[in-house]
């Protein structure tokens, strides 16, 4: 129950914060067109800003309450403000919470003030800057700051969240723009709508690319080379789900940008234009629903044990892939060939989209290239695995462990591997690798500690 309250608190405050930030960025961009400042649909969302700022504050209170309960291990502290204040005063998390709460309160005050004034572009720029403050402060309570509280660790994650807000936060404004009543006296024309949407679409493309780049940087630090955890841990499965939802969103955004928006601006039949507007309304709504789900998954992911700290107690597959599967130079070149072919497949997808290939051609050609790349590279990278392959000792090695290991080695391994583990084979040809050499030959890189444990216990 506490975990559910914590997840909903984090999700609600982050969603509200991103919407205020993204809408203000969108308005600051489109306010270059003066006609936008006199429309009613923009007033509707402006009136929601103070309410959303209030949601941010209530979400932060929920975060403090659940954090206190989890930190103390006492469920009743969820409702005990006195213990909350102890956490706020005595912990670093509490100090960061104060900064987040003060910045959210400032955001509430400034939104209440500006909705009473005549609209100016600099108002939205200022509100966007203020809305960014709670977001940036929240990154100091993330996994990125857990290992090292430094600019290099936190900045990529902060930029990643702000870029996400630029895209996701603008979706409600775009929906209200699409659903604005054309019969109103201050309504904007379909041409103006398409102009605003096209301008945002031009901004969204580099934003999404930078979002992917910063996401890769942040994820790489949290995975730390332990890529097997991506298919065998809670963090990995949540990340895969997040990427799957993102792929659907990008597909919708591609069709919005390249199919329906051009029809709105192209002179032609009104029926085609109405159909494109209907499609935009339908699919942008669907995109927003997926975006809400994406933010929820990202919120849960941000509070899940990172992949680099995950313990894979039971590897569920009878195989694994490794670049150390072979030390044969020819085999390694073949693996590189397969990887190059996979990159060619990605290039074929990009070329097909740019050249407007048919759907069949766009699926078949990259599909054949991907299958060929897999058939070339994967067999050479495949190693046999066991449930214990990625198992790690739960305690550090000590003198007793080493002593017991020496006895086991002397009783079971000396005959083949020698007393020092350098092997017993008398190899004359330097090109031939001694398979019994456990000390100096590179073939031992294909074995994990868990594999060795499996061999000793079976």
Please describe what each predicted stretch is.
Residues 363, 367-368, 374, 402, ...:
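Periplasmic c-type cytochrome electron-transfer domains
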Residues 400, 406, 410-433, 458:
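Periplasmic/extracellular electron-transfer cofactor-ligation site
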